[in-house]
Amino acid sequence: MFGQRQSMIVYLHSLKHAKILRKYGNIHYISKRLKYAVVYCDMEQIEHMMQKLNKLPFVKKVEQSYRPFLKTEFENSRPDRAKEYDYS
């Protein structure tokens, strides 16, 4: 039902135009202080959306999130010592 999603970080000159980003995907977060927005869209459309967003006059730059491509299971990591003890 749902496809794979990926986020883009869109840096803006002004937050006045942040509502326009709704056309390009789901807005997850907007930082007022650092002037960026996190926008989610389908993985198949990520390159196309990045090109469209870069053409907008109020956008400084667009970066792709690499989180879906990172390995989240770590090898040789030591377990936490506090969790080793049974407190029952």
Swiss-Prot record:
Lipoprotein keyword on record: no
Record InterPro entries: DUF2129 (IPR016979)
Localization: Cytoplasm
Keywords per UniProt: Cytoplasm
One cellular component term from this protein's GO annotations in UniProt: cytoplasm
Family membership: Belongs to the UPF0298 family.
Protein's UniProt name: UPF0298 protein BcerKBAB4_3759
